[in-house]
């Protein structure tokens, strides 16, 4: 078998091409891209040459990546299916305090059912709560910031990058040590939201505010049987059940949810398999094409000059802003392993082959900065689509980046100075 040093740099090109297509196609050719069949064809075409190359030269590395893919999809699909069986209805008074509390609760829930599950569970109730108000365009934006991204930083269940880290050997409870970064970032962004929403609330007419008060309906949650299935998934990950039993139990939990949850409830929740199918076909291509790049990064990563925690935070986050944050995490995790091997530990602990200060920076960068654009993390576009469906005026792609540039970038600079300088 060829040695890793024989891998040509061009072998990393399909990975970059595929991620660029994921970023560009929804904007350039939305009608083509909206069909999962077309996504699957594109992913297959781009990844096929690398698949053949790896089968011929590095079958073991390919097998490891495909094993990670199966574990990754088992977790994502089970959380998506189970959370889709929980329906939250009702309409409470849409004050800045209530909205801020809604987002804070969503940030906590994201660590249990994932950012995708939390987003799908909570976005419609939050929009319904604010439906009588007119000045609400900022609400989906902050929802994406907090619930769809930053919130899911404390467990491997929270966001796909952290689960991939767990598969690479990061202990399940280690991510709880990111609590200071998580709390500080949330505190800043929630404070900005509260101030922003307070000004927006003052612009509402008295008529709309009266409509909001008279339209109050108590919050009700249906499908709570699914909490048992969620607990099953959490426990099987938390207690580090080995593969393939871990994945089998996740599949059984999802199947149980599908069987016992009334179809009418999922219909009310507008549940479909479209989003998870999209993730499955695209990530099949990603997990194949990223193998050579990760091998190259591990081999030559120290030559890139990225060695400090703040560099890893911004490089991981910057790439995660425009490409998907899960494979970005893996790429920089591999780079950090190379840096740790070549430059030493500096007396710091090592987790899954990575110096702990670098691992903190990579984890926070991947999770937090997936919020910088609509394409940084899977739930972002889904939240945007649901908001538009409910006639909420949300910013376009670059308008959203103006929000993130104004709010998130200064926040991340502060976080860098406190934790990663």
At which residue positions do the language-model features occur?
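Transmembrane alpha-helix boundary signature
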Residues: 50-68, 80-95, 108-121, 291-300, ...
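Structural signature of hydrophobic alpha-helical transmembrane segments
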Residues: 5-19, 64-77, 110-119, 178-188, ...
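Transmembrane helical segments that form the transport core of multi-pass membrane transport proteins
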Residues: 232-340
């Amino acid at each position: 078998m060829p040695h890793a040093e024989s891998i040509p740099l061009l072998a990393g090109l399909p990975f970059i091409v595929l991620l660029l297509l994921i970023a560009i196609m929804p904007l350039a050719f939305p009608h083509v891209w909206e069909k999962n069949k077309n996504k699957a064809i594109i992913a297959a075409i781009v990844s096929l040459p690398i698949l053949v190359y790896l089968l011929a030269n590095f079958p073991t590395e390919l097998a490891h990546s495909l094993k990670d893919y199966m574990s990754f999809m088992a977790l994502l699909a089970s959380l998506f299916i189970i959370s889709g069986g929980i329906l939250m209805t009702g309409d409470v008074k849409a004050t800045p305090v209530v909205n801020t509390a809604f987002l804070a609760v969503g940030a906590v829930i994201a660590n249990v059912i994932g950012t995708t599950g939390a987003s799908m569970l909570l976005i419609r109730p939050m929009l319904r709560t604010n439906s009588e108000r007119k000045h609400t365009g900022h609400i989906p934006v902050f929802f994406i910031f907090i619930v769809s991204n930053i919130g899911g930083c404390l467990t491997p269940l929270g966001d796909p990058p952290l689960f991939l880290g767990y598969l690479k050997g990061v202990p399940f409870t280690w991510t709880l040590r990111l609590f200071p970064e998580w709390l500080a970032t949330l505190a800043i962004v929630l404070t900005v939201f509260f101030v922003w929403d307070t000004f927006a609330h003052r612009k509402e007419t008295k008529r709309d505010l009266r409509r909001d008060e008279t339209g109050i309906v108590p919050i009700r949650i249906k499908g709570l049987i699914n909490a048992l299935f969620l607990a099953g998934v959490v426990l099987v990950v938390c207690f580090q059940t080995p593969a393939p039993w871990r994945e089998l139990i996740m599949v059984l939990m999802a199947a149980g949810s599908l069987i016992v949850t009334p179809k009418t409830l999922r219909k009310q929740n507008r549940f479909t398999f479209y989003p998870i199918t999209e993730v499955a076909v695209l990530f099949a291509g990603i997990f194949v094409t990223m193998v050579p790049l990760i091998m190259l990064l591990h081999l030559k990563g120290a030559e890139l000059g990225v060695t400090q925690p703040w560099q890893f935070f911004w490089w991981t986050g910057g790439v995660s802003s425009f490409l998907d944050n899960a494979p970005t995490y893996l790429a920089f995790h591999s780079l950090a392993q190379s840096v740790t091997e070549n430059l030493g530990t500096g007396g710091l602990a090592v987790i899954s082959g990575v110096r702990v200060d670098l691992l903190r920076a990579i984890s926070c960068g991947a999770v937090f900065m997936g919020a910088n654009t609509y394409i940084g993390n899977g739930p972002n576009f889904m939240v945007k689509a649901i908001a538009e469906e409910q006639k909420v005026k949300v910013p376009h792609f670059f308008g959203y980046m103006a929000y993130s540039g104004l709010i998130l970038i200064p926040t991340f600079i502060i976080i860098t100075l406190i934790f990663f300088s």
